[in-house]
Design a protein with these regions (language model features):
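Membrane-interface aromatic/basic loop that binds lipid-linked glycans or pyrophosphate carriers
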Residues: 1, 260-305
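Glycine-rich, basic loop-to-helix element that forms the pyrophosphate-binding segment
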Residues: 65-82
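Short aromatic/hydrophobic "clamp" motif used to bind/position activated sugar donors
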Residues: 87
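Conserved donor NDP-sugar-binding/catalytic core segment of glycosyltransferases
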Residues: 101-131
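Catalytic core of nucleotide-sugar-dependent glycosyltransferases
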Residues: 201-209, 214-241, 262-277
Length: 305
């Protein structure tokens, strides 16, 4: 069993894959690895670039698909064929710091953590010009023995994760009812995790080019709402404090969609927003179901089905 499995969904990344894969090749540290790339029916030359750029790397799998389902589905697909103790999850249009994986893996083993999150740095450079810096030894790391509480905060949505494969399986991976995995993955993992590490280590460097699905604002609002709504409905046993927090997040996502011009029950939403601020909103009430229906009616978002 390898120490880590890189699980890497790919969609139309032909132009940037050579630089990302170069940073994979340049990883330092004493660990064994396998590489699982899952192509999401790319319409560019991503598959041929993957084959060319990974030639000579041991233990590479390239999983091909004929339909486009989104990163949440493809991440789960890749995780199912992984065999490593830990999964390493990155976006394929960034550059990885040379000791990123060794740093995350070392932290996980030192603290007995089953999920570790690193930071990212947005640059003004094209990806070809990025020279990611080595992570220093004296990085600050917060240890969270209540992972769900931390996951309901901010700052964990970037794909800079190292997680135990067993935890990923136990949590069911990403919510496949939501196209983008950024919000659902940390939430679902944290609900089952024993220890989450949040480190200041900058593990990926992000170029000033291209576009992320999560840059689409209505897609972002839709997927945030659906993530929290699904989680609420799937976990009726959650503590009331967490249910209240999740309800607030649903209201916030809907309010932002309304602000951006999408049809929502406006007056009721404003009342719900202020009720949530006062801790009076009931997350189990019918109003969230009405918002769910409103989001389902929005045509300008991508859905796995």
């Amino acid at each position: 069993m390898p120490d880590i499995s890189y699980v890497l969904p790919v969609y139309n990344k032909a132009a940037v894959l050579p630089f990302f894969i170069r940073s994979l090749r340049q990883q330092t540290g004493d660990f064994s690895a396998e590489y699982i790339f899952v192509d999401d029916a790319s319409s560019d030359d991503s598959l041929s670039v993957l084959r060319a750029e990974t030639a000579g790397i041991a233990d590479v799998q390239i999983v091909e698909n004929t339909d486009n389902k989104g990163p949440a589905v493809r991440l789960n697909q890749g995780a199912k064929v992984a065999t490593g103790e830990f999964l390493v999850l990155f976006d394929c249009d960034e550059v990885i710091a040379p000791n990123a994986v060794a740093t995350l893996l070392g932290l996980a083993r030192r603290h007995g953590a089953d999920m570790v999150h690193g930071k990212w740095h947005k640059t003004g450079d094209a990806i070809a010009d990025i020279h990611a810096r080595e992570i220093p030894a004296d990085i600050a790391t917060q240890v969270h023995e209540n992972p769900l509480k931390r996951a309901l905060g901010k700052g964990l949505v970037r794909m800079t994760w190292l997680v135990e494969r067993g935890l990923f399986a136990k949590a069911g991976g990403c919510d496949e009812g939501v196209f983008i995995q950024d919000e659902s993955l940390p939430l679902r993992l944290a609900a089952q995790a024993r220890c989450l590490l949040d480190t200041t280590a900058v593990v990926t460097w992000v170029p000033d080019e291209g576009s992320h699905l999560s840059d689409n604002k209505i897609q972002q609002h839709h997927d945030r709402f659906m993530t929290f709504y699904h989680f609420l409905r799937q976990h009726p046993q959650l503590d009331a404090t967490y249910r209240q927090k999740l309800g607030q997040k649903c209201i916030s996502a809907a309010r932002k969609a309304l602000r951006d011009g999408y049809a929502m029950p406006g007056l009721k939403l404003q009342f719900a927003y202020f009720a949530a601020k006062l801790g009076l909103f009931k997350a189990d009430g019918a109003f969230l179901d009405a918002l769910y229906t409103a989001f389902k009616m929005i045509p300008a978002v991508r859905r796995p089905d």
